[in-house]
Amino acid sequence: MSKIKKILSREILDSRGYPTIETEVHLKTGYFGYSSVPSGASTGSKEALELRDNDKNRFFGKGVKKAVNYVNTEIFQALKNKNAEEQKELDNLMIKLDGTKNKSRFGANAILSVSLSLAKAIALEKNIPFYSYISEINYSKNNFSIPLPMINIINGGMHANNNIDLQEFMIQPIGAKSILQAVQMGSEIFHMLGIILKEKGYSTCVGDEGGYAPNLKSNEEALSMISLAVERSNYKLNEDITFAIDCASSELFNKKTRRYRLKNENKEYNSIEFTHYLEKLTKKYPIRSIEDGQDESDWKGFQYQTKILGKKIQLVGDDLFVTNKKFLEYGIKKKAANSILIKLNQIGTLTETLETIKKAQENKYNVIISHRSGETEDTSIADLAVGTNAGQIKTGSMCRSDRTSKYNRLIKIEESLNTQKKTFKKKLNLFN
């Protein structure tokens, strides 16, 4: 039995320079796993709570000493001498101890840091990669796939201090035959875009997720420049590269007027009009994936958008579903969206994350494993994408080590799988 000997948590810094939590779980066998937890900027209102200290005299209130203390005391005492292999039971025990609907007592950040570290400790003890152990506890042993990346190359919205309304402009290298080639394609296009921005007199500073963050005239100008970067990199639109956008529509939505405002373009749209605004973009540019194309509370808007675009475009629910199986089940019933973004810290445990992924896959919803805008060097999401056979991953741009660390981990996983000659699929297509 792999008994828990010690749990040790601490404050570290995330990619924005604010505190987050890192936790080690030590087993009596001498093995230990550790993980750190990311933080979002544009967060869904239904997400599990990220516990902050709110002490304005320290880190502007963003400290996580309370979360660290809960892990080092109450959570450790509850898990001490327990079998770390009982992932589901221990995750459920932490949820029960927390005693709230949204993990607001301990904080989802505290609980998740322990949940991931438990699994990593057992993977090390078993001498298997983390993705293999994820596959094992997900009851899909050795059913691996290397995910198609969504590579963020222009940041806007809450992820950058610029005037672009839509939050993320991404490319997907659908013509790649491996993650190594996908990364090469992404890197070449990213750097070519930087050259084009300089030629046009725009800034090449980057945003939270490593994409360029210039002030542009419109959302369409961003798409136009990315198209040019693809062509000048000697790749073909639709054949080698398609586009993906994250609207983060809840940040554009006025709940009083129930209209979406694009400040940079000085335009407003109701729910139906905004769907047709996006539809127009998909006809002009090779956009094959739209995330959060409506406000998180606008289920009817999502239903209409799915009816209009859902047969040809990947419509991703992020704030809509917040990695919560309950909201996903409702969306499936209402035929809202056709894909789900998975963020570990939106729900707060590995067990609940795996349950949501399985529910999505059973109902033929595409799954995209995702980072957050405030990241760490932790590469858990790369293993999660491979181990659950998710098919896609969204982990930022081709710069900033908090983003490239995930791509580098995927390269190593692919190399390992090739060396072991294991049977696995490279899901480098948008739809299964």
UniProtKB/Swiss-Prot annotation:
The keyword Metal-binding applies. Pathway: Carbohydrate degradation; glycolysis; pyruvate from D-glyceraldehyde 3-phosphate: step 4/5. This is Enolase. It comes from Buchnera aphidicola subsp. Cinara cedri (strain Cc). Its cofactor is Mg(2+). Binds a second Mg(2+) ion via substrate during catalysis. PROSITE patterns: ENOLASE (PS00164). (2R)-2-phosphoglycerate binds at Q167, K343, R372, S373, K394. PANTHER family: ENOLASE. The gene is eno. Its EC number is 4.2.1.11. One of its GO terms (biological process) is glycolytic process. It catalyses: (2R)-2-phosphoglycerate = phosphoenolpyruvate + H2O. Keywords: Cytoplasm, Glycolysis, Lyase, Magnesium, Metal-binding, Secreted. Component of the RNA degradosome, a multiprotein complex involved in RNA processing and mRNA degradation. It comes from the Bacteria. Mg(2+) binds at D246, E291, D318.
